[in-house]
Regions:
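Signature of the first transmembrane helix
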Residues: 9-63, 90-102, 124, 154-163, ...
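Single conserved hydrophobic/aromatic residue that forms the stacking wall/gate
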Residues: 213-214, 218-225
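Interhelical loop/hinge segments that connect adjacent transmembrane helices in multipass membrane
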Residues: 1-6, 10, 145, 188-216
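Transmembrane-helix boundary and interhelical linker motifs in polytopic inner-membrane proteins
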Residues: 2-11, 36-42, 54-88, 92, ...
């Protein structure tokens, strides 16, 4: 890629990144206002109890692979493939641990309803892990317009799901399913726009190299987003 072409793509990426952030904030504000009128504070509290577990699991799951793949000078299919299967295995392991830890979480908060709610909510880790490789492919190729369409479309669909469920009395389940629908739509669209597909080859050699890249270098992704 020539310097001129890279500059043009970076400039477009900055534009679409800013546009995406603005639209997402407006959508979040709009959907948030509607949901606040339909739900009680206790409904948000139920989901909020799981936030710390979600944050820790999400950090462990992604592991900086998107930025590492974006930074790597030459990225091959085997690199994306290694990240896909490694992330899926890690997220599945985390989910299994949290699945069996659900009763302990519920006991800690003295809220039995958290058992089924947490087991549903934590499914998002497994689903989102499958989008790491194709999303990294889009960022690597500076296809920020596509990631903008993906993010906005996912927000709209999940917002409609959340409002519909909340309006029909699903309470905190509506919030949980809104999150799951957002992750699911985003994962599907990442595959659709990237045209990247995993192969059943389990070579995790690139994982160590990508981990070192993430630790030692900044990333274009940080600038664009």
């Amino acid at each position: 890629m020539s310097d001129t072409s890279l500059k043009e793509k970076t400039a477009k990426g900055l534009f679409w990144g800013g546009f995406s952030n603005g639209i997402q904030q407006l959508l979040n504000l709009g959907f948030g206002i509607v949901l606040a009128r339909l739900l009680d504070a206790s409904d948000y509290g139920m989901v909020g109890m799981l936030t710390i577990f979600s944050a820790i699991a999400a950090a462990l799951q992604e592991g900086g692979f998107i930025s590492a793949l974006t930074n790597r000078k030459e990225t091959l299919h085997k690199d994306y493939n290694a990240v896909f299967w490694f992330s899926l295995m890690c997220s599945t392991t985390i989910y299994i641990l949290l699945f069996f830890a659900a009763p302990l979480i519920a006991d800690f908060y003295d809220t039995p309803e958290l058992i089924p709610l947490s087991r549903l909510s934590f499914l998002g880790f497994v689903i989102s892990s499958m989008s790491i490789a194709p999303r990294a492919y889009l960022f690597k190729n500076l296809r920020i317009k596509d990631t903008t369409v993906i993010s906005i479309s996912s927000l709209i669909v999940s917002g409609i799901v959340g409002i519909t469920l909340a309006a029909n009395g699903f309470a905190y389940w509506g919030i949980a399913l809104q999150s799951i629908s957002f992750i699911t739509v985003m994962t599907i669209l990442n595959f659709y726009f990237s045209h990247w597909r995993p192969r059943f080859r389990f070579d995790f050699t690139p994982i160590k190299e990508l981990s070192l890249i993430h630790i030692s270098e900044p990333t274009r992704l940080d600038v664009i987003s």
